[in-house]
């Protein structure tokens, strides 16, 4: 079974509730605007909520409120995850940032196109837009380990992956796009403004998924 949670900000309530309905999500958590828990802490709350309702063997998916899902989302994601080459899956590989990853992304996307690969596999979760983890035990391990790290949730998860020599598998094409709207984060950890252009390299679905993969 696929369990889905939405990480939401009050300024995007309408967007978040539409996403909640579109993907038939199980959980939604708002980062209260008066007593903010913070973006990273809100991610952790959603993961923890999903652990409480998930069973062994379930995929647990955390979506940010600006995720744009493909049609027939649950069916599409379930079909892809049957062939996942890793227990950690990102549904989004985006252009625009971070700049240091762009050359490698471009090469991987070109190779995936040539080889008709369903997956691009690397040692980092570059984006937090949509991440799925197999089983509540692994999610609990992630929560336990990443609390020791600093930085945004995607960077913390990347450190966790590298520490335990795990990989993140990106669906190709991406099963969620990124609604390239104004950020709700007042100050990003790197101090840099977010420019437009943060959309998926490829967005859509496949008629048939496989375990064919290329490296990132």
Stretches with model-predicted labels:
Residues 1-63, 67-216:
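An acidic/histidine-cluster motif and surrounding catalytic segment
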